[in-house]
Amino acid sequence: MKNPESSGVSSSPQIQRVSPSSSSTSPSPPSIGTSSCFTLSSCTLPIAAVVVAVDVVDIMSVDPLAMTSAFSISSLPTTGPLGTIAVDSITLLYTPICLCYLLVRLRKVNFEGNKLLMVSVVNFVPL
């Protein structure tokens, strides 16, 4: 009776050993996919950097239509995974720049408004 139980116990670890070996082969494709995605993202980051740099030049020149250059992102190819990742990374990088641009524009308008208010007060005092 003891011999069949020990043989049954020894057969179950063999089955368990087969299962981890089959599961160890399945993590290999995700690691390959991860490395290929990493390669795609490393390829798209320079594209995003160039587009963002062009937009920063537009913003630094205080172009009032610099916000409309966001629509130029739609001209990028979005059919493949490269285009999708490029648009996503450009959106992530472009949104803070647009918000900063709006804040600078609002602050500049506020500063000019205060300047006009000070000029009008100075002109009003001598009268």
Curated annotation (Swiss-Prot):
Positions of the UniProt region annotated as Disordered: 1-34
Bilayer disposition of the protein: Multi-pass membrane protein
Q: What is the predominant subcellular site recorded for this chain?
A: membrane
Q: Give the record's GO CC terms.
A: membrane
Q: Please list every transmembrane segment annotated in the UniProt record, as residue ranges.
A: 47-67, 84-104
The protein's UniProt keywords, in alphabetical order, are: Membrane, Transmembrane, Transmembrane helix
- Bias-annotated ranges (Low complexity): 9-34
Where is this protein localized, as stated in its record? Membrane
What does the further note read? Answer: Partially overlaps CTI6.
Q: What is this protein called?
A: Putative uncharacterized protein YPL182C
**Protein's organism:** Saccharomyces cerevisiae (strain ATCC 204508 / S288c) (Baker's yeast)
